[in-house]
Amino acid sequence: MADFVNIALPKGRLGEKVYSMFEAAGYPCPSIKENNRKLIYENSEVGVRYFWVKPSDVSIYVERGAADIGVAGKDILLEYCPDVYELLDLKTGVCRMMVAAMEDYRSDPDKTLRVATKFPNIARSYYDRQRREIDIITLNGSIELAPILGLSDVIVDIVETGKTLYENHLAPFE
């Protein structure tokens, strides 16, 4: 079996952008662009093996040695604090962590703040610094629904353009 560099790519837009960077750098894998359900894509000519994984799992594959290289967002590194070496910032998929709420929301500092997020460690750290009592509601998707349906007061989520927030009458809160 040939020696390969194993590269964990995050599924989705970021992964597609990053694969294009590897391809442009001379590490193509034409089969990755085929419409199929393969899990692993190899190019033995350049010694590269790519696999798509859930973004939150990229660092686990690297930390546990299944991948030599992984590309993950800073949000993943901050949330999970994996024991990995951060080589560089690719300056792609630029996003920001944001607290948002319904446009008309007014906070009551004497009341426990209900915070919906898929980043409970980041949210807890932020509100600990604010000395604010919170109740974290951990969700795995559609975080914006939580304040709309009254599940939470605010959300802590990663935002690229903010379009989804504004289209759903949410606004930056803090």
What are these regions (language model features)?
Residues 1-174:
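Domain-level signature for soluble enzymes in the chorismate/prephenate branch of the shikimate pathway
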